[in-house]
Amino acid sequence: MTRTIEPSFRESVDLMFNRAAALMDLPPGLEEKIRVCNATYTVRFGVRLRGQIQTFTGYRSVHSEHMEPVKGGIRFAMAVNQDEVEALAALMTYKCALVEAPFGGSKGGLCIDPNLYEEHEMEQITRRFAYELAKRDLINPSQNVPAPDMGTGEREMAWIADQYARMNTTDINSRACVTGKPLNAGGIAGRVEATGRGIQYALREFFRHPEDVAKAGLAGKLDGKRVVVQGLGNVGYHAAKFLSEEDGSRIVGIIERDGALYNTEGIDVEAVRQWIVKHGGVSGYPDATHSAEGSEVLEADCDILIPAALEGVINLSNADRIKAPLIIEAANGPVTAGADEILRKKGTVIIPDMYANAGGVTVSYFEWVKNLSHIRFGRMQRRQEEARHELIVSELERLDRYLGDAWSIRPDFKLKYLKGADELELVRSGLDDTMRIAYQSMREVWHARADVDDLRTAAYIVAIDRVSKSYRAKGL
């Protein structure tokens, strides 16, 4: 029997790109220019730790500079390699184009297991990596702007921003060199939750269109839908929390490194999160059935499957056993090209990663703009909005007194209406708007073209078209 070989992550991205590009009329040579990575840098540096020098290997890939700066996260993991960062950089290009964030695509990574080092050691390593990238202009507010990814967070972004500022003491925009920073270091409200919140907004927009929902063999709204989440990290946790608490979805399965939980009646996401923090995993959690094999829950009966961890978790070996009629890719590349083909033939609807997890880069865009403008969102207009609303409320109260029992103001109306939007509300509003418009641009292609039978191909067509127009505007 001939064994089918799974393509690499980079090859999977290229296969999906090629499928969409074949349906487009691009100028000769431009398809190749868009597809290939412009450059990938490998840096090796030493750090003296525990009495000896340890050498680390890091990468920063720049996929496309049709718009600058380029944008993309930095991940810390032992599995980081050139193929991975190039695939992720390519996805960043298409993702930014799809949601109309004015960036090219980039990605970086460091081969390291953060669990093996103390905090002060991680700071040394991160600062040195930042130094190696910054001196090559691979960290710069106007050229290359990193963000958090797997294994990194606000802490690492604060170290990187400070290291860049130390190296560029006269750059007034130094805080804009990286996004995903803590609020007290130039960050923005809502960045930590952004990708998970984007998943929620993406699903809400999908369920606003009954004909799209019907394609997945579903009906109705998010309320009551059975959801399985693979990976309860930052993205999976926030997506599951918001869907269960705000939309009435039922989280029936949670998959983690040490196994999985399943309960058809629903799982308390917050309780599981606290259990993981305390015990290091889901094993022993009392209010759900524990399975040592996460694959059992990945393949369980549910309405919505959210792969929110690593790439390639749904592949040729398990695609035909996936029962969920709707998959939303919270992680980057969780479905391989081969698995994607199997699932499409089964009729599974996949909301693709380049759209679904774009909440992170969207709010990073807002943070970058905030850093360049040197003022938080809402500072100039919030009180003025409240004053205008006060005039309306005063007039309504006068009418209330005049009309008596014939008409009255709801008790909580004044409190809600008088409160001007703060930064978090503005960020969420901007993210919601972005996710709605991006979905509608994909949906238009999906429904208008007979040769496009899935959202991923539609998303690639929209993104490639926008990138190609940027290159042609440059005279290429």
Residue ranges of each PLM-predicted region?
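Rossmann-like adenosine-cofactor binding region
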Residues: 259-350
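Flexible, glycine/charged-enriched surface loops at secondary-structure junctions
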Residues: 27-33, 100, 138-147, 171-174, ...
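Glycine-rich phosphate/diphosphate-binding loop of Rossmann-like nucleotide-binding domains
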Residues: 189-299
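General beta-strand structural signal in soluble alpha/beta enzymes
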Residues: 87, 171-172, 253-256, 306-307, ...
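Adenosine-phosphate binding glycine-rich loop
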Residues: 3-8, 206-207, 321, 325-476
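Conserved active-site and cofactor/substrate-binding residues in soluble primary-metabolism enzymes
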Residues: 8, 12-15, 38, 80-83, ...
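N-terminal ligand-binding/catalytic initiation module
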Residues: 1-194, 200-202, 206-207, 356, ...
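Structural motif
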Residues: 59, 109, 143-144, 175, ...
